[in-house]
Amino acid sequence: MTTIGTPLSPRATKVMLLGSGELGREVLIALQRLGVETIAVDRYENAPGHQVAHHARTIAMSDPDQLRALIEAERPDLVVPEIEAIATPVLEALEAEGVTTVIPTARATRLTMDREGIRRLAAETLGVPTSPYRFCDSLAELQAAIDDEIGYPCVVKPVMSSSGKGQSKINGPDEVAAAWEYAMAGGRVSHTRIIVEGFVDFDYEITLLTVRARGADGEIATQFCEPIGHRQVGGDYVESWQPHPMPATALERAQEIAGAVTGNLGGQGIFGVELFVKGDQVWFSEVSPRPHDTGMVTMVTQWQNEFELHARAILGLPVDTTLRAPGASAVIYGGVDATGVVFDGVDAALQVPHTDIRLFGKPESFVKRRMGVALAFDDDVQTARRNAAEAASRMKPRAV
């Protein structure tokens, strides 16, 4: 039986989120609806999650001393990492000491904090299909890896980055040096290690939201949401839709791969498993042990969206991954470099049929920063995609 206390009381059920961007914000809201006391942590003040949590804290989460001190002071029941740049050895130590429980586990957080840990687990330990890859610590090693094994075209990524930062495709030898420099500039922490991957000739890529939650018998079971299709530009998602049509054989294989990877990582919660698909062939790409940006579409497509699924699963509550309606999401960009922007056109955006918007409340805007998302549902995915894109285009951020 799951028992939840009253927030701001001695018996409160306390959950701390490490990382309080737009995804963390929605998780916090879902937790609060279930009566949980929430603590939002980020590296800068007034982060989106700070604006909705019971408590807002600002620290350098990659600093082990700061992270340990905060967790020991707050004593949350659960610690939920929402970003990769965290001092994971501290989480492992605190979990081992019985101070708190890390979601999904401290080990899973460590393995998925960069591309090397999870790629080696998937390809070398579990033997699931992936693109050919090498890890490199210098430009010379990168060039040698391409010449000796990977070939052209190929994709270079920092071992630790998010939202496509530092990622580029190399089509020939004259692009290698620039790709290396771009990866160095885009990494999440001071790091000189990259992954170079052989280019997979795929038909499309999907996110398969995979939920590990307790069933009626008390045992952890795995459930899958309908596949989410998405379009990326420069490694960063610009629109997503659900469901994405797939052959039955490919879907079954995708679920097998996602189940194997998340089962090894263990724990409870939602995982965003990214996969490449060509016909009936499926390759594993990446996994995040948390809600996924492409999964924001579930706020209009599912009875329980990805944030509610995560909140329920980590609290030991039952989940339902049923699709409610086809739908789509489209990114609303900042459009300007400024702080405290205002958004014109909100009324015009919401005049598009079956649409909704989420503005994230980020204190600083950049031209290509994701500041919100337009959502749409309809009888078919294509109509929903058109409407979401139209609603997003009507949003007009401006500096004041």
From Swiss-Prot:
Record Gene3D superfamilies: 3.40.50.20, ATP-grasp fold, A domain (3.30.1490.20), ATP-grasp fold, B domain (3.30.470.20)
Recorded family membership: Belongs to the PurK/PurT family.
Record bears the keyword NADP: no
Protein name stated in the entry: Formate-dependent phosphoribosylglycinamide formyltransferase
HAMAP family: PurT (MF_01643)
Binding-site residues for N(1)-(5-phospho-beta-D-ribosyl)glycinamide, renumbered to this chain: E22, L23, E82, D293, K362, R369, R370
Keywords: ATP-binding, Ligase, Magnesium, Metal-binding, Nucleotide-binding, Purine biosynthesis
InterPro entries named among the record's database cross-references: ATP-grasp, ATP-grasp_carboxylate-amine, ATP_grasp_subdomain_1, PreATP-grasp_dom_sf, PurT, PurT/PurK_preATP-grasp, PurT_C, Rudment_hybrid_motif
Involved pathway(s): Purine metabolism; IMP biosynthesis via de novo pathway; N(2)-formyl-N(1)-(5-phospho-D-ribosyl)glycinamide from N(1)-(5-phospho-D-ribosyl)glycinamide (formate route): step 1/1
Catalysed transformations (reactions): N(1)-(5-phospho-beta-D-ribosyl)glycinamide + formate + ATP = N(2)-formyl-N(1)-(5-phospho-beta-D-ribosyl)glycinamide + ADP + phosphate + H(+)
PANTHER family linked: FORMATE-DEPENDENT PHOSPHORIBOSYLGLYCINAMIDE FORMYLTRANSFERASE (PTHR43055:SF1)
An individual GO BP term: 'de novo' IMP biosynthetic process
GO cellular component annotations of the record: cytosol
Protein residues bound to Mg(2+): E274, E286
